[in-house]
Regions:
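An extended, acidic, His-containing surface patch that forms the Zn2+-binding/catalytic region
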Residues: 60-65, 90-92, 250-283, 287, ...
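Short pre-catalytic strand/loop immediately N-terminal to key active-site residues, enriched for Gly-Thr
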Residues: 120-132, 366-368
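Acidic/His- and Gly-rich active-site-bordering loop/insert found
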Residues: 2-124, 148-153
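Generic non-transmembrane alpha-helical segments
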Residues: 16, 26-30, 34, 50, ...
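Hydrophobic beta-strand positions in extracellular immunoglobulin-like domains
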Residues: 86, 215, 303-305
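Short glycine/proline-enriched loop/turn "hinge" motifs that connect secondary-structure elements
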Residues: 20, 107-109, 151, 202-208, ...
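Acidic/histidine-rich catalytic neighborhood of metal-dependent amide-processing enzymes
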Residues: 132-206, 210
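Acidic-enriched catalytic cores of C-N bond-cleaving enzymes acting on peptides and small amides
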Residues: 203, 222-293, 307-334
């Protein structure tokens, strides 16, 4: 009897989702058209207000919450989040769908409008189509179908759209967690529809350690570099040491966890940006850049480490490398500023939500 009921529900949900495919595309397009670039953190309120209208129509009680005082929050770029909750007929556990609303910078080389949401050959193109406005749209459509198929469900359903995931989440999930919105008493199960292979369940993530490294020199006239000390050349030695020593060592470290994609099994580090010398001229000006010897050069690093590694060891490895350069390079001075740290996490593969999703993947896609 229970098996027949499940099969009937599966058929009903499949049909309801099928007839909503066009709505899924349109919702994804609408979300893409709201340019929530982070940094700096644009249009968070606009996307929250859009989601508020959508969720309110299907009976969700919503809250739009500003993460006031968090990193990046300002009157110009306030960090807004939305949480919607819908209670079932009877009490029970809560399933929460969380998606971040921010997207990274656009970059170069686009052949489509990055905020146009254009459909081409069966795909939606735009910044955030994959990461992760498509996932946000999918969770809303799935919940809409579920509510129609199971109007008398038990427990509660929540959907959130949160800010700043791309820059650490302090103005989003972290703030809401500190305020108790994800407490075990309120939420028992969480699904985050981040982009991955559709037949895979991601149970955890690597740790992250972000830092700024600054090397120092002495400013001087460009015609007399011997009178100064070039901070960019000092940074060049740091980058060379990364290439010669650090990156090869990271390549050797491989997790025992079943991680995909393959490259994520290793420890990694990205050099996000580099800035050296004087202020760049106004792009609209025809002036030539400064000819001074630079007295400062800064890089931002993003070190992703394995669950088998310790964040303090990760930090010490960078500092030891810099101290090694200092011991052999005259006038080498540096400063390390920690910007962010995220500890690796792992969900038990026997958790009810994991087993339920695994069963659904097998049912829909025929894959275990």
């Amino acid at each position: 009897m229970a098996s027949d009921k499940k099969n009937t529900l599966f058929t009903s949900l499949s049909e309801l989702i099928e007839i909503r495919k066009e709505s899924l595309v349109e919702l994804t397009q609408d979300l893409i058209k709201i340019p929530t670039l982070n940094p700096p953190g644009e249009n968070y309120l606009e996307i929250c207000e859009y989601l508020n209208k959508r969720l309110s129509k299907i009976g969700f009680e919503t809250q739009i919450i500003r993460a006031k005082g968090t990193p990046g929050d300002s009157d110009k770029y306030p960090r807004w989040n939305i949480i919607g909750r819908k209670e079932g007929k009877n009490s029970g556990e809560c399933v929460h769908f969380n998606s971040h609303t921010d997207v990274v910078e656009v970059g170069l080389g686009w052949t489509f409008d990055p905020f146009g949401g254009q459909v081409f050959e069966g795909k939606v193109y735009g910044r955030g189509a994959c990461d992760m406005k498509g996932g946000l749209a999918a969770s809303i459509i799935a919940v809409e179908a579920f509510l129609e198929a199971c109007p008398e469900y038990n427990g509660a359903i929540e959907i959130s759209g949160t800010a700043d995931e791309e820059t650490g989440g302090y103005g989003g999930v972290a703030y809401l967690a500190e305020k108790g919105f994800f407490s075990p008493q309120r939420v028992q199960h969480v699904i985050i529809p981040e982009p991955l292979h559709k037949d895979r369940i991601c149970l955890g993530h690597r740790g992250g350690w972000w830092a700024e490294i600054e090397t120092f020199g002495e400013i001087a006239h460009g015609a007399m570099p011997f009178a100064g000390d070039c901070a960019v050349r000092h940074m060049g030695e740091v980058l060379n040491e990364f290439e010669e020593t650090l990156f090869p060592n990271l390549k050797k470290r491989v997790t025992e966890m079943p991680v995909i994609p393959e490259g994520a099994k290793n420890s990694t580090m990205n050099i996000n940006s580099i800035h050296g010398g004087q202020v760049e001229p106004d792009p609209e000006s025809n002036a030539l850049p400064s000819h001074c010897v630079p007295d400062s050069c800064r890089i931002i690093i993003d070190r992703r480490f394995l669950i088998e590694e310790n964040v303090e060891e990760v930090k010490a490895e960078i500092e030891d490398l810099l101290e090694g350069i200092k011991s052999r390079r005259p006038k080498f001075k540096y400063e390390v500023t920690e910007l962010n740290r995220v500890i690796p996490s792992m969900t038990d593969k026997e958790a009810p939500i994991v087993k339920s999703i695994a069963a659904s993947i097998e049912k829909v896609l025929g894959k275990k």
